[in-house]
From Swiss-Prot:
Region (NEMO-binding): 753-758
Name the UniProt record assigns to this protein: Inhibitor of nuclear factor kappa-B kinase subunit alpha
Activity control summary: Activated when phosphorylated and inactivated when dephosphorylated.
Species this protein is from: Gallus gallus
Gene3D superfamilies: 1.20.1270.250, 6.10.250.2110, Phosphatidylinositol 3-kinase Catalytic Subunit, Chain A, domain 1, Transferase(Phosphotransferase) domain 1
UniProt enzyme class: transferase
Pfam family of the protein (one): IKBKB_SDD
Feature: compositional bias, Polar residues: 691-703
Keywords: ATP-binding, Cytoplasm, Kinase, Nucleotide-binding, Nucleus, Phosphoprotein, Serine/threonine-protein kinase, Transferase
Gene Ontology CC terms: cytoplasm; cytosol; IkappaB kinase complex; nucleus
Residue segments, region Disordered: 1-20, 691-715
Family, similarity comment: Belongs to the protein kinase superfamily. Ser/Thr protein kinase family. I-kappa-B kinase subfamily.
Record-level Gene Ontology MF annotations: ATP binding; IkappaB kinase activity; protein heterodimerization activity; protein homodimerization activity; protein serine/threonine kinase activity
GO biological process: cellular response to tumor necrosis factor; positive regulation of canonical NF-kappaB signal transduction; positive regulation of transcription by RNA polymerase II; toll-like receptor signaling pathway; tumor necrosis factor-mediated signaling pathway
Length: 759
């Protein structure tokens, strides 16, 4: 009995969309798109009209032989038992579609909206390979998926860009393996000798119909990764598989690339061809990994098993590459990127020493900014320069500034031309055959895109400098508000002090003739008044306030400047023109046709000129930003000095106020004591009024040298002093209220400040 019949679903009803996949649907499921067509089946996207749920349905489009029906059903069996984030997941077939088509059941799978890897590679901007972040993401995802399949004793056998789909999950692109129609379950036999699949990515042993193992997937995977790096397959990619097979099979085990010269000679290499987009620190381990994956000998391919872990060496090396901690630093003084492999627990200071050796900028003058404008924390390790899970120099950058410079000279020399591009720039009218011209123009497009991306990175560095400036400015505003608040509090205290001391001096003068007097105290109070006038100089911060306001105006103008926004529109337009030219060239038949490169060279020259212009504007604007930042740095210590002066004046005023209060209370104590003594003397005199000996007669010289007791206060004088003290206490209450209001005003100042100009 056929395996399809064992499943039991009824045959498809007549006229449903799945018969020939016309526009239509099954019940609430509407067909929205045709996703792909394989050797036997179609894959279409269906969407539920009510819930919006989407599912990819694979249906058979041909009448199959018994053998192929078994293979079809075998794929469904494999899909249903797999569960891995990098292998496309099988779903339950919707009830409305649960029927047979061409005597086999349907396969329902999760829908991945990002298209396949071939679609990504075919984009003209990727004609010389993908970005490093994309390559490393693919390496991680597909490597993990292949390991999972092999651990479950499944060989895919047909790995190719068309069978890798992309899905956006939470803003991160995930790669998934699809189409297990050719997969071989090793439980059916450890080796297999039959295969019909895509030849360009096929392992050599499959050409020769030899026995094979899991290492056939290594060859296909290595070929895919090479293509993602370089933009083309590694071995004579322009030739048909059966042609290059004979020329390549005697290659050295370490050869990972072969190209055909104009004279027909095949040139082998152990290195990746230029241009590509991967960092120099990754190139060597990546070449070593490709040498393992592209070994012609299936027994040696993958490097065998590691004796300690019993894992394939190729996957251990892959994990090593993916776990490298590399910090990429854009030197804004030279527009050059320097990369460093971080050591475990490396300190930031040690990294800065390495940066000094590479760039010549001393550690003391280095300012390392993240994209957010935050300066790296010297107390934290150097690993703060990288983000876990984020790989590739095109994804994350640290920006290096020289604090000893505020004027950055620019623009700098543009990136160097490749040998091929330089060839057509030197003579744009030279006629080249179309196949060769495609390669040259691909590198030209890569060069134009590179110029635009160089500008974009420098603009991001300028933006980091602006964000850093705004952080400094926010700190300046905070310190200014503290200074103004402290100045206002000091002014209020000094006003109170002047008013109270003037009143004290007036009242002291009023009672001095008949009350208590002290020349020493009077002199001290007058000195206090003069000292308070001197303290008032500390509250004068107008000159600083003027400088700060002028600087604020300058910063706002820089924010409003058109150079604060990206100026790459012209380069983007030129990039699109270069891409369009390349597209037109690819549509031309390659046979016996020649063409020149006049139009492409014009675009290259215009892009270089445009980049030169926008970089000149960028570095001019950057120099102004750094100039403003330096002004803030210069102002901050002046504000600190002003705050310290205000604090010292405040302390001095409080000490004088306390000293005067203590003296007043001392006077009050004396007055009260004298009042009590006088009352006792008066009572005693009244009791002995008839006794002459008890009568005290002042000496004749008292007019010039009064007896000490002559300054003793009368009861009425004591009451006057009590009034003075009460009045001083009233002033003290008023002063406390003024201080409280000043504190509340300070607390509200930051909240109510208009920050809109910072946006």
């Amino acid at each position: 009995m056929e395996r399809g019949a064992e499943r039991g679903p009824p045959p498809a009803p007549g006229g449903v969309a799945l018969r020939g996949q016309p526009a239509g649907g099954c019940g609430p499921w509407e067909m929205r798109d045709r996703l792909g067509t394989g050797g036997f089946g179609n894959v279409c996207l269906y969407q539920h009209q009510d819930t919006g749920a989407r599912v990819a349905i694979k249906s058979c489009r041909l009448e199959l032989s018994v053998k192929n029906k078994d293979r079809w059903c075998h794929e469904i069996d494999i899909m249903k038992k797999l569960n891995h984030p990098n292998v496309v997941r099988a779903c339950e077939v919707p009830e409305e579609m649960n029927f047979l088509v061409n005597d086999v059941p349907l396969l329902a799978m999760e829908y991945c909206s990002g298209g396949d890897l071939r679609k990504l590679l075919n984009k003209p901007e990727n004609c010389c390979g993908l970005k490093e972040s994309q390559i490393l993401s693919l390496l991680s995802d597909i490597g993990s998926g292949i390991q999972y399949l092999h651990e479950n004793r499944i060989i895919h056998r047909d790995l190719k860009p068309e069978n890798i789909v992309l899905q956006d999950e939470g803003g991160k692109i995930i790669h998934k393996i699809i189409d297990l129609g050719y997969a071989k379950d090793l439980d059916q036999g450890s080796l297999c000798t039959s295969f019909v699949g895509t030849l360009q990515y096929l392992a050599p042993e499959l050409f020769e119909n030899k026995s094979y193992s899991v290492t056939v997937d290594y060859w296909s995977f290595g070929t895919m990764v090479f293509e993602c790096i370089a933009g083309f397959r590694p071995f004579l990619h322009n030739l048909q598989p059966f042609t290059w097979h004979e020329k390549i099979k005697k290659k050295d085990p370490k050869h990972i690339f072969a190209s055909e010269e104009m004279n027909g000679e095949v040139r082998f290499s152990t290195h990746l061809p230029q241009p590509h987009s991967i960092c120099s620190l990754i190139v060597e381990p990546m070449e070593s990994w490709l040498q393992l994956m592209l070994n012609w000998d299936p027994e040696q391919r993958g490097g065998g098993l590691d004796p300690e872990t019993n894992s394939p060496k190729c996957f251990l090396l892959m994990d090593h590459i993916l776990n490298l901690k590399i910090v990429h630093i854009l030197n804004m003084t030279s527009a050059k990127i320097v990369s460093f492999l971080l050591h475990p627990e490396e300190s930031l200071h040690f990294l800065q020493n390495r940066i000094e050796s590479e760039t010549g900028i001393s550690t003391g003058n280095q300012e390392l900014l993240l994209e957010t404008g935050i300066c790296l924390d010297p107390r934290k390790p150097a690993s703060q320069c990288v983000i876990d899970g984020v790989r590739g120099w095109d994804s994350y950058m640290v920006y290096l500034f020289d604090k000893s410079k505020t004027v950055y000279d620019g623009p700098f020399a543009s990136r160097s031309l490749s040998e091929c591009v330089n060839y057509i720039v030197q003579d744009s009218k030279i006629q080249l055959p179309i196949p060769q011209l495609r390669k040259v123009w691909a590198e030209a497009v890569h060069y134009v895109i590179g110029l635009k991306e160089d500008y974009s990175r420098l603009f991001q560095g300028q933006r980091a400098a602006m964000l850093s400036l705004l952080r400094y400015n926010a700190n300046l505003i905070k310190m200014k508000n503290n200074m103004v608040s402290a100045s206002q509090q000091l002014k209020a205290k000094l006003e109170f002090f002047h008013q109270s001391i003037r009143l004290d001096l007036e009242r002291y003068s009023d009672q001095m003739a008949y009350g208590i007097s002290s020349e020493k105290m009077l002199k001290a109070w007058k000195e206090m008044e003069e000292k308070a006038s001197h303290c008032a100089q500390a509250e004068d911060i107008g000159y600083l306030d003027e400088q700060i306001m002028a600087l604020h105006t300058e910063i706002v103008e820089l924010q409003k400047s058109p150079y604060a926004r990206r100026q790459g529109e012209v380069m983007e337009s030129l990039e699109q023109r270069a891409i369009d030219l390349y597209k037109q060239l690819k549509t031309r038949p390659p046979d016996h046709a020649y063409s020149d490169s006049t139009d492409m060279v014009k675009i290259i020259v215009q892009t270089v000129q445009s980049q030169d212009r926008v970089l000149k504007e960028l570095f001019g604007h950057l120099s102004k930003l750094l100039g403003c930042k330096q002004k803030i740095i210069d102002l901050l210590p002046k504000i600190e000095v002003a705050l310290n002066n205000i604090k010292e004046a405040d302390n001095s005023e409080m000490q004088m106020q306390g000293k005067r209060q203590r003296e007043i209370w001392h006077l009050l104590k004396i007055a009260c004591t004298q009042s009590s003594s006088r009352s006792l003397v008066s009572s005693s005199l009244e009791g002995t009024a008839s006794t002459p000996a008890a009568t005290w007669v002042p000496q004749s010289s008292s007019e010039y040298a009064p007896h000490p007791l002559s300054s003793m206060a009368t009861p009425g004088d004591g009451e006057n002093f009590v009034d003075v003290i009460e009045e001083n206490l009233n002033y003290l209450d008023r002063f406390s209220s003024m201080l409280q209001e000043a504190r509340e005003e300070q607390n509200n100042s930051l909240t109510n400040f208009d920050w809109s100009w910072l946006k």
